[in-house]
């Protein structure tokens, strides 16, 4: 039984979400290429990146995830700069979009080990934003390191009108589905331990 879970991510949001489950973590960020391959469907993209992250980090039990905002089939990753964040926010303004997270749990046990994964989708309805709102928000710096250029758990939450599905997925890690994958990998959650 793995006593410690390795999180293959430097995301403070994923760390905070897992802390809500009472999990002791070892943080080992994965160094992987997160570019979308030509013609790669968004679901395949987030799952591929999550798997690559999980495989790139040593450990008995490794958890990795990748989140993307998808609008009209286009993956909106983290903005390159403030202008790119403005472009993304203008595109999201007044629309419904999807947030996809690929989650991978890799357990190195026995001769073969186990790799379990899932893709979770959440639909988000965004308010109509004017240039003043967009400029103010980009000026806060908050959207510059977030997929799709917004943080539902921060000031960007003021622009979200509706969420269908997992809110924690939009933050960066679907907790219910992640807990289910950990259980299937033989990792008991804190409330299941003697």
From Swiss-Prot:
GO BP annotation list: nucleotide metabolic process
A Pfam family of this chain: Maf
Catalytic residues as annotated in Swiss-Prot or TrEMBL: 66
Subcellular location: Cytoplasm
Primary site of residence: cytoplasm
Keyword Oxidoreductase carried by entry: no
A cellular-component GO term for this protein: cytoplasm
Top-tier EC class: hydrolase
Reactions mediated catalytically: dTTP + H2O = dTMP + diphosphate + H(+); UTP + H2O = UMP + diphosphate + H(+)
Record's keyword annotation contains Hydrolase: yes
InterPro entries noted in UniProt: ITPase-like_fam, Maf-like
Function: Nucleoside triphosphate pyrophosphatase that hydrolyzes dTTP and UTP. May have a dual role in cell division arrest and in preventing the incorporation of modified nucleotides into cellular nucleic acids.
Name under which the protein is recorded: dTTP/UTP pyrophosphatase
Native species: Anaeromyxobacter sp. (strain K)
């Amino acid at each position: 039984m793995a006593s410690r879970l390795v999180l293959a991510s430097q995301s403070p949001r994923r760390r905070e979400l897992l802390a809500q489950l009472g999990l002791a973590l070892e943080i080992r960020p994965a160094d992987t290429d997160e570019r979308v391959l030509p013609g790669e469907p968004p679901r395949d993209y987030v799952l591929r990146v999550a798997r690559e992250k999980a495989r790139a980090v040593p450990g008995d039990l490794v958890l990795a995830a990748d989140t993307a905002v998808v609008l009209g089939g286009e993956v909106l990753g983290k903005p390159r700069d403030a202008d790119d964040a403005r472009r993304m926010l203008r595109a999201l303004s007044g629309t419904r979009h999807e947030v996809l997270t690929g989650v991978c749990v890799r357990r190195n046990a026995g001769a073969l080990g186990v790799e379990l994964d899932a893709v979770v989708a959440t639909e988000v309805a965004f308010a109509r934003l004017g240039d003043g709102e967009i400029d103010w928000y980009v000026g806060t710096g908050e959207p510059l390191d977030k997929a799709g250029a917004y943080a539902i758990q921060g000031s960007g939450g003021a622009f979200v009108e509706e969420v269908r599905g997992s809110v924690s997925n939009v933050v960066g890690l679907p907790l219910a589905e992640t807990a289910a994958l950990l259980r299937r990998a033989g990792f008991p959650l804190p409330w299941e331990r003697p």
